[in-house]
Every structure is written in structure tokens, then in C-alpha cells.
Amino acid sequence: MSGLFITFEGGEGAGKSTQIALLASHLRNHGFDPVITREPGGSPGAEAIRHVILSGNAETYGPAMEALLFAAARADHVDQLIRPTLAEGRIVLCDRFIDSSRAYQGVTGNLDATYMAAIERIAIDGAMPDLTLVLDICAERGLSRAGKRRGSDTADRFEKEDIAVHEARRQAFLEIARQEPARCKVIDADRSQEKIADEIRSVVDTILTEKGLL
């Protein structure tokens, strides 16, 4: 894979989709043609599974089987979109990827790390992100933002969970970043959109320069 694979991680209301859009605009201004995608979803098969997961219907299967659903969606996403796009030398910007599974199913789902690592390995088949931007914000602030963004729409099953669960996921993302500093960059998301975007652009531009692409 010769392109650049960038993932955005963080809790509810961290501003991932906003920052992905701003980074995509920045990249287009520099002549790149980035592909924006998301998880769960990103391919027809994965989008079908997304509906099952976010509706809450998958909860009846239990955490272990739900993790397999996420893995199945991810495998299809990687095969149908991510890997072919990277093979074209393009940039992929993905809203959530493996670290969300580690935090959501692995940590707060209390699943064994060996089990999670095994299904992750099968699902991505070597398609690791080149850069993961962890947008960090305290759970209370993030949920408040998510509620304002949602308006009168119904909260999905994850937003409805207890604030302690959201904070545990936040800490899980931060721990992943501590363990994998070469891949992960923590971004303070409790700032203005412009300041966050400036830092993200700086990080990405540095990588593009190092690769001789900018």
C-alpha cells in the first residue's frame, strides 16, 4: 500500500467528522484527492452491518459476537475501499478504525486482549494506519457537544451509555496513544475548531514533507 492512511479516534462529540472535513479541504488545496470514510461502514457490506450495530439489535448477541460483527464490517471495508484506494497512492481519512474496537469492545466490553488482537489481525490483514489522530476531550464535554449536534434526533446506543463508560473509553484511547507513540498523536479537542485544525494540518504536513509529497 503506497498511499497514506490516517485515522481519527476519540469519544462521542470529540469533533472527528468536522476535523476530517477540514483536513480534506486542506489536502485538496495542495493537490491531493483524499477519500473520506468511516467505521462501522465505508463499504456496502459494512454499512449494512453498521445499521445492525448502531440500532442496538446486536447487543443481544453479547460483546464477543458484537466484536465479530465489527471485525466483519472492517474486513469488508479494508478489502473493498481502503486497500484499493491506498494502492492508487491516495490518502484515506477514516472516522474510527481499530482503536475504537479496542476501546469500545475491548476495554468497556471487557473482552480478552488476545481475542481482540486475533480478530483485529484477521480483519485488517496488515492495513495499519500510518497516523492515528486521537481527539481528546473529557466525556462530559464531549457528550454535551454530541447532544447539541444531534438536536432532536434520537441518540444512538453508544451516546446513551453512562458517563463513566465514556470516560473509561477516553482513558483507553489515551493508553493506546501512550503505547504506540510512533503511530498515535493526541490532539487536545477542547479548543476552537481552528486551533485543532491548525495542529492537525501541521502534523499531517510534516509527514507529507517527510515522504517527499509536499
Swiss-Prot record:
Enzyme superclass (EC): transferase
Keyword Transferase recorded: yes
- Which catalysed reactions does the entry list for this protein? dTMP + ATP = dTDP + ADP
* Record GO terms (molecular function): ATP binding; dTMP kinase activity
- Provide the alphabetized UniProt keywords: ATP-binding, Kinase, Nucleotide biosynthesis, Nucleotide-binding, Transferase
Family assignment from sequence similarity: Belongs to the thymidylate kinase family.
Function summary: Phosphorylation of dTMP to form dTDP in both de novo and salvage pathways of dTTP synthesis.
Q: What is this protein called?
A: Thymidylate kinase
Species the sequence originates in: Brucella ovis (strain ATCC 25840 / 63/290 / NCTC 10512)
Q: Give the gene that encodes this protein.
A: tmk
